[in-house]
Amino acid sequence: MAEPQDLPPELSPNRYIEKVSLVTNEVLEEEIEPRQLLVHHHRDYHVVDVQARTFMSRLVDATGDEDLAREKMRKIRARGFKAAEVIAKATGLKDPEKVSRALFGLKEREYYFRYKKHPASREAIDARYAELRQQGEEQMARARDEAGRPRLRVLLTGGTGFVGKEILWQAAHDPEIVEMVVLIRPKEIRDRKTGELLETHSPAQRGESLLGQLWLETPEERSKFRFIAGDVEQPQLGVSDEDYAELQSSMTHVIHCAASVAFDDPYERSFQANVTGTLNALRFSLGLQQHEGSPFVAHLGIETSYIHGRQVRKVAREDEIVFPRNFYNNFYELTKAMASLETERFMLEKGLRVVQLCPAIVIGESQGGNNRGDTKVVNAPVNVFGRAHEALRDPDGDWFERTRASMLARMACIFPGNPSAELNLIPVDWVVKGILSAVKRPRAIGERVHLATDNRVTSEQIRDIVQEELGVDIKLAEPTLHRTVTLPVLSKILTGLKQPRIANALEKLGSIFGGYSEWGQPIHEVGNDVRVLGLPEKRPNTQHAFRMLCRHNRYVQDFGRIRDLDEIARREKVWAQLMEELEERSGGPAGAVSAADFRAFINERLDADSFVLR
């Protein structure tokens, strides 16, 4: 078991969370360790616990009834405690709980966690939000021209990220956004061997390159963008006093999109990026809002719908955040939840006007799967599966090398997941439509909006789509046995074959994504996207979007091998033309075209080697 972490007070989970006795309902005055807040800390501690979780998982797979599995487990636990009492009595032991813990891994939960509640009453909170919305409406009226059209000036953090790039693309074609200032750090280019500084790319240089990669090439398209130096982990976002003074008199909105989306980051790194970065952005926006004569309307915080953690099939509501009964999958989710609490505090105590926008798991855009070169999150396992299939299909080397490559590829095609587990995947273009809609709707101030879907996709459907599109035979492994038995064995084998990178990759895929492909996933409530933001009631077809992700990663990115962003941008422009042609020919979305027909179309119209249209 890992040693307790010695954290500085400003990083302590106790700032946000209370540990409460189930016996007395009193708050336990003891330090909460970050690892105690993750699901990994509370499972696999006993061989019987492993077997019980495996039994529940298989029962869900067989029946599709999660409530039945929980009821069966409650009965088994009750029998285990009763058996421990009998054994303790027969052997003269005084503490049956020690017996149950030693023999069966059973333990009564003695405490629970909850978020610290703000002292304001519900009525006071609602009144505060109504006041902030009214202020926002008045500020938005000031931002309109004589014809009543909004003239919005937006500052964006995280513009070089996956979602940030889509914000730039859509903003470029939005006439109501007349200026967008993008915070971007200078980039140092160093010699790989010596570490010597070769050159530094300024924010303006990086911005020009970024706009080119987004196909924004004309002076008209580029004229609304300005790139300035900044760093969200620094006070005042690292913006110079001169720039900040100018922004105070011009900006109507701040979109804080910068974050760490690494699911395997340690607590301290996740906290610094997600909580400290959010606090810096909130203080920055408060300074804009409080400036005399400021045109500032609202701050938009981009969070995640997974701030609700492992709720186990309970609906995660948009209007509240509670500590999840079954903890968090990782520190990314936990620290984003902490950042959401800080955001609420700034609204209630400091009067900052904020809209909280919470995307689910964001994937490539809905028409063509375009992901702007991203290779993380859902793209990572798809790329692994694709490369594994190629290794099986076209083995190189002598008999030994071919055998080893085949074995490695088959290992890579084992994925932990229950067939019925549901993932909430949402295309990036839908997410950004929601973000830019929120910019124009002051009524969204004080609201938390899930930019998620009501047509979730199951692990089984993902497996089938990958098989159809990539030809990969994915084996869904029972998550608990995979985590506790299969993965350690595979890691030993791979280490013996001198393949530590593959072993590490498999371990990462299992630990990072396994939590999202287990049964008992939360259901993220949706509705504010339509009611508050005015988005269409019909959300994107998730299966079509995931199918396009697979196709895009196969043809455009070559499963992550194409890393040059300029080349990816060129390919994605060709790809977009292809998808428009396909949709015109088929009369429907490209994602609805069968795998066989899609491949035939690509072979007809695309020279795959040079990636140009035939």
Q: Could you say what each language-model-derived stretch is?
A:
Residues 271-275, 328-337, 371, 375, ...:
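Short-chain dehydrogenase/reductase
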Residues 105-253, 257, 267, 292-293, ...:
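N-terminal Rossmann/SDR dinucleotide-binding element
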Residues 388-418, 484-537, 568, 574-575, ...:
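A hydrophobic C-terminal alpha-helical subdomain
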Residues 434-511, 552-587, 594-602, 614:
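Mid/C-terminal beta-alpha module of Rossmann-like enzyme folds, strongest
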Residues 97-115, 121-133, 137, 153, ...:
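Amphipathic terminal alpha-helices
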Residues 249, 253-258, 264-272, 276-331, ...:
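Conserved Rossmann-fold NAD(P)-dependent oxidoreductase catalytic core, especially the SDR/UDP-sugar
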